[in-house]
Amino acid sequence: MADPGTLSTVASITSGFGVAMLFFRIQRELQMGKEGEPVWIPLADWLLVCATLVSLLLVILPLVALTAAAGVLRRLPAAACSASSVLVAGYILSILAHYRLLFGRKRTGPRANPEPAEKILVFMTGALALALFTYILLAAE
């Protein structure tokens, strides 16, 4: 199992990336609203929101607050850190699908939220992250 220093470093990087992207997205959407364009948060961005919250609440917080955790609580930061890494990896593919750069190049017209390929990738990513989280959390030592 990874040491607390490594887990907190990975969670901090994930959180920093997620918060930076969220500020970028909000700024962009406010500008789009001023231009009369539809305003939305792409479904793919919710992967980053979830990864950020998981990193802060299920990795950093337990590492700081629980000094002598045992059993499932001891594995919680590692499970959450692994899941948030999957969420960030899935975000990359999903946001590319949202902008039709990865899948959907033959689609025309305005983008939908979510794009069909984006929706599939987001749900697959969420399922994989949840499965990995559960596996690590419940794995016997």
Model-predicted regions and their roles:
Residues 39-141:
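Alpha-helical transmembrane segments of integral membrane proteins
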Residues 1-21:
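Hydrophobic transmembrane alpha-helical segments in integral membrane proteins
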